[in-house]
């Protein structure tokens, strides 16, 4: 069968590869001029089944109010007056209970674990090199109360066999010698978590897709799905129609917009995330893997000779404007935990729109 994949981010490229392996003819249609150039471009690079957990959780409303008042805000909500935003937030509130949280956390963990296993198979099969590291994740807790709560809340990790350790700040320096142990009360180490450069992975897998016969159409923005009766028969790119037996939507947030063209409503909302990428200037002071700051919800990830610092959850609608002040938060966290390890003046700021559902 001929299958069109809409979107050439990490989800689209991986979908194309597995469809090719199943014997299908594949065309990938992408609005931008290269693969992984939007949401997959510069994310935090975390491969963390142990950390996979819904945002919609008990107590998140109270936490959110504290975050909104913080000087360095990990959460930004800018009301846009739309019913869509209000409805999405209300739906998320409905998932912030213990029953829904536990169920969704199990699903997310299982999905993340399966995904990581498939990534290992691809890496071995195709000899992919994407700055991958298997050095675990370290989540640091600044406030003593947060650290105590972490120590009391390891049941899920134990029940699901997630290898972990509870570490003192000094013990953390065995894994991250450059970290400032004076800045936090304790840390949770998830031993089997990994890191990698999402964009680099997608670029290399694209080459294998093309070698296997996939066609990539860049600068082809899909405007709507093409219906024949009640069946999707392809996509429309402006005035042009591209026919296919099936269509796979992997267009991030814009999947929601495309489904609306055939009368289907899904609760996907764009949540902006920010990252900065900085060159390392002192190897001894630089992070070795991923370090998560619980208080600021920021991830610091080693990527070759650079460090990627990602975080911020900004709900401000579909506008793609960047807010440079968010860079200050990312710089503050990096310099606080790993002082003088990188050239902050050379920081490259990026913003991507996470496709988020209200269940977290």
Describe each PLM feature range:
Residues 21-41:
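Glycine-rich FAD pyrophosphate-binding loop
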Residues 30, 168, 218-220, 347-350:
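Short loop/edge segments at beta-strand edges and connector loops
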Residues 43-46, 51, 55-95, 222-234, ...:
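Active-site substrate-recognition segment that forms the wall
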Residues 11, 34, 254:
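Conserved Rossmann-like nucleotide-cofactor binding loop
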Residues 103-116, 139-149, 171-174, 188-207, ...:
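Short beta-strand to alpha-helix junction loop
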Residues 2-28:
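N-terminal Rossmann-like FAD-binding beta1-loop-alpha1 element of flavoenzymes
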Residues 148-160, 179-246:
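Helical element adjacent to the flavin cofactor pocket in flavoenzyme catalytic cores
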Residues 44-169:
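Dinucleotide-binding Rossmann-like beta1-alpha1 core, especially the glycine-rich loop
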């Amino acid at each position: 069968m001929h299958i069109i994949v809409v979107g050439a981010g990490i989800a689209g490229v991986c979908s194309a590869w597995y469809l090719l392996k199943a014997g299908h003819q594949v065309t990938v249609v992408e609005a931008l001029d290269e693969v992984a150039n939007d949401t997959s471009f510069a994310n935090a690079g975390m491969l963390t089944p142990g950390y996979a957990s819904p945002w919609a959780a008990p107590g998140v409303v109270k936490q959110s109010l504290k975050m909104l008042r913080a000087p360095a805000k990990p959460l930004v909500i800018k009301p846009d007056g739309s019913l869509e935003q209000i409805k999405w937030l209300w739906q998320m509130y409905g998932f912030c209970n213990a029953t829904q949280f536990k169920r969704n956390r199990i699903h997310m963990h299982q999905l993340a674990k399966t995904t990581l296993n498939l990534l290992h198979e691809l890496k071995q099969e195709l000899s992919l090199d994407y700055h991958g590291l298997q050095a675990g994740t370290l989540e640091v807790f600044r406030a003593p109360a947060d650290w105590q709560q972490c120590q009391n809340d390891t049941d899920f990790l134990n029940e699901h066999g997630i290898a972990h350790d509870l570490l003192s700040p000094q013990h953390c320096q065995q894994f991250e010698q450059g970290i400032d142990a004076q800045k936090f009360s304790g840390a949770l180490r998830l031993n089997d978590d990994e890191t990698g450069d999402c964009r680099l992975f997608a670029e290399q897998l694209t080459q294998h897709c093309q070698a296997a016969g996939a066609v990539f159409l860049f600068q082809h923005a899909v405007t709507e799905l093409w219906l024949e009766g009640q069946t999707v028969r392809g996509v429309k790119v402006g005035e042009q129609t591209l026919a296919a037996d099936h269509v796979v939507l992997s267009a991030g947030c814009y999947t929601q917009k495309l489904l609306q063209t055939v009368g289907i409503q899904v609760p996907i909302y764009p949540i902006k995330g920010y990252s900065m990428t900085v060159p390392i200037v002192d190897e001894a002071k630089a992070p070795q893997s991923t370090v998560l700051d619980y208080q600021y919800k920021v991830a610091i990830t080693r990527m070759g000779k650079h460090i990627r610092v990602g975080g911020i959850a900004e709900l401000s609608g579909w506008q793609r404007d960047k807010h440079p002040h968010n860079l200050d938060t990312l710089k503050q966290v990096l310099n606080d935990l790993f002082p003088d390890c990188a050239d902050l003046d050379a920081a490259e700021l990026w913003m991507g729109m996470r496709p988020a559902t209200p269940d977290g």
